Amino acid sequence: MAFSFQLQQVFPFPVKFCSQPKSIKLQIFPNLTKRLPIHPLASAQNNATSNIDHNYIAMDESSINEEEVPLPTELSRELMPKHIAVIMDGNRRWAKRRGLPVALGYAAGIRVLRNFVKLSYNWGISALTLFAFSSENWFRPKAEVDLLMGLFDKVLKDELENLARTGIRLSIIGDASQLPKSLQDLIDKAVMATKANSRLHILVAINYSGQYDVVQACQTIAQRVKDGNIEPEDINSLLVEQELQTKCTEFPSPDLLIRTSGELRLSNFLLWQLAYTELFFSHSQWPDFGEAEFLEALCSFQQRQRRYGGQSS
């Protein structure tokens, strides 16, 4: 049965993003509500977001199983990827196609992300890298940027205790210096509080550029050469990899990349790290990406023969 709630005082997005009524009654579609519990979204900072109760994106604590969970029969544990990277694309288009405010597209996307993390945790994935905000996203309307910053802030505050309790480690890759100071402080707190956890490592790419990641690694190596610590002939791919921002994880190169919404590009994400990654492009918008779609991606991955540039056997 569809779930409805009131959205009060919709934030003033430009007309091209959404309409601006004072009160809208929204139907959350049955196929989405069956997968995850419905909760309202909290307002973002700077009064830029919709006034949806933040429980809309709260964690269903019963969904995390700290014991080993049997895999779906279609999957082999021996062939599971250790590290999955995700470009969570399509939140805005999902909302627009339904005549909903963009804020609800992101809210639905966060609910789906929670389910995705739950499944990854229960199915034994070791690392997730999530493309949350690119360095190019600053060019979006200020109201939308403020919304996203507020969402990052709210989710971190709400989930820090759960992350620590369930053994999930959080790391941030990207240039955090441009984020709001309060968000930077919260990120530092969350990273420190979870750094000893090892059940699942979640890397969130915020203000991230794959090109700049390589550039900053080269700058660091160049400085080491200048300081006389290494010679130019010491530079190799392993040394570069050790200076990339994904050096914080045990598995810096993803085994599988999933991109939703039917777009067939990398969008400046993990350009070095994806050299031998298997790619899976889903036609589903991110808010529609559920367990069935995740299972399809994993089955596709397990049917492939990874050659890393070599010949097939």
Curated annotation (Swiss-Prot):
It is an enzyme of class 2 (transferase). The active site is at residue 89. GO terms for cellular component: chloroplast; chloroplast stroma. It catalyses: n isopentenyl diphosphate + (2E,6E)-farnesyl diphosphate = a di-trans,poly-cis-polyprenyl diphosphate + n diphosphate. Its cofactor is Mg(2+). The keyword Repressor does not apply. Expressed in leaf trichomes, stem trichomes and old leaves. Expressed at low levels in young leaves and flowers. GO terms for biological process: plastid membrane organization; polyprenol biosynthetic process; response to cold. Keywords: Chloroplast, Magnesium, Metal-binding, Plastid, Transferase, Transit peptide. Gene3D superfamilies: Decaprenyl diphosphate synthase-like. InterPro entries: UPP_synth-like, UPP_synth-like_CS, UPP_synth-like_sf. It is found in: Plastid, Chloroplast. Transmembrane segments: none annotated. Residues 1-42 form a transit peptide. Pfam families: Prenyltransf. GO terms for molecular function: ditrans,polycis-polyprenyl diphosphate synthase [(2E,6E)-farnesyl diphosphate specific] activity; magnesium ion binding; prenyltransferase activity. Its EC number is 2.5.1.87. It comes from the Eukaryota. HAMAP family: ISPT (MF_01139). Catalyzes cis-prenyl chain elongation to produce the polyprenyl backbone of dolichol, a glycosyl carrier-lipid required for the biosynthesis of several classes of glycoprotein. Belongs to the UPP synthase family. This is Dehydrodolichyl diphosphate synthase CPT5, chloroplastic. It comes from Solanum lycopersicum. The gene is CPT5.
